[in-house]
UniProtKB/Swiss-Prot annotation:
Disulfide bonds: none annotated. It is an enzyme of class 1 (oxidoreductase). Transmembrane segments: none annotated. This is N-acetyl-gamma-glutamyl-phosphate reductase. GO terms for molecular function: N-acetyl-gamma-glutamyl-phosphate reductase activity; NAD binding; NADP+ binding. The active site is at C149.
């Protein structure tokens, strides 16, 4: 049984990790840390865990965490910078759900996150944990950078078009919408019920922190950095991301449905829906699945790709567990085969 540590387990991605690991057939949470809640039982803070664990939060002690096989960081930016190096030196593998190691250029990371990069010496060994493009590198990785939620939905939607060289990469558009849990569990006026409910708005149009990550990923696939207009929106719901993606086709003869079905045929967590489909966020709620539909309206020169994920699962904690499974030689789907709850 894999012994897992979780640093920062009081946020939404942290408790989602707990939910997934407590039901996992090959792993278990062994150390769960929180500076502000040390000594408190997990199930006292999260009653949904009652009957599943007797663990209590502890202080983030590197010595205790180093006894784990793998440590997940579900923390604000900068925390993994400070702790990952020591854990790696002690032989513990690290899976970071924050953005600390996603961007390979330390100076670029600093510009977008407004602070110096705290561990640039670790960037070369960090593997970007999107299994659909990096599966061969993940098993041997010591440090995994789990992709962000928007980058996951957007990248999975665009990848087949870019790999095939079918579109004008200078003019891609990603119109993405997220539920409020994407902002985290901290108190914010804009996330209050009276502010977010019955409301819909764009934000970060001038530049969102996920933009350089998306550009890096799509650039790796396309062989050159694309031109991308990325506009995120806030939806009045708790979970879910819907990304509507647009690209101008260079080749009008390719069967886009067949392209997507063939590209993702062997992917356990990407579901290409039948022609004419419009995937719904509720169909992936609580699951590690990405559902995709591809369209070519009126037979024109524009490809429209619709991509939905649960931002807390495939967009965060589920993808982290998927990476853990690959790192430790477990079935990739272990602990991740749940079905979305409807309605």
């Amino acid at each position: 049984m894999i012994r897992a540590g979780i640093v920062g387990a009081t946020g939404y991605t942290g408790v989602e990790l707990l939910r997934l690991l407590l039901a996992h057939p090959g792993a278990e949470p062994a150390v769960v840390t929180s500076r502000g809640n040390a000594g408190e039982r997990l199930d006292a803070m999260f009653p949904n865990l009652r009957g599943h664990t007797d663990l209590a939060f502890t202080e983030p002690d590197p010595g205790l965490l180093a006894e784990c096989d793998v440590v997940f960081f579900a923390t604000p930016h900068g925390v993994a910078h400070a702790m990952a190096g020591e854990l790696l030196s002690r032989g513990t593998r690290v899976i970071d759900l924050s953005a600390d190691f996603r961007i390979r250029d330390a100076a670029l990371w600093s510009r977008w996150y407004g602070q110096p990069h705290g561990a640039p010496e670790l960037l070369d060994q960090a593997v970007y944990g999107l299994p659909e493009i990096n599966r061969k590198r993940i098993p041997d990785a010591r440090l995994i950078a789990v992709p962000g939620c928007y980058p996951t939905a957007v990248s999975l939607g665009f990848i087949p078009l870019l790999e095939a060289g079918l579109v004008d990469t200078a003019h891609l558009v990603a119109d993405a919408k997220s539920g409020v849990s994407g902002a985290g569990r901290k108190a914010q006026v804009g996330m209050l019920l009276c502010e977010a409910s019955e409301n819909f708005k764009a934000y970060g149009v001038a530049g969102h922190r996920h933009l350089p990550e998306i550009l890096q990923t799509l650039g790796d696939v396309a062989g050159q950095t694309p031109g991308l207009t990325f506009v995120p929106h806030l939806l009045p719901m708790i979970r879910g991301i819907e990304a509507s993606l647009y690209a101008v086709l260079k080749d009008m003869d390719t069967d886009l449905q067949a392209l997507y079905e063939q590209r993702y045929a062997a992917e356990p967590f990407v579901d290409v829906m039948p022609p004419g489909s419009h995937p719904e966020t509720r169909s992936v709620r609580g699951t590690n699945r990405c559902r995709i539909a591809v369209h070519r309206p009126q037979g024109g020169d524009t490809a429209v790709v619709l991509s939905v994920i649960d931002n807390l699962v495939k967009g965060a904690s589920g993808q982290a567990v998927q990476n853990m499974n690959l790192m430790f030689g477990l079935p990739e789907t272990a602990g991740l085969d749940g079905i979305a709850v409807l309605p």
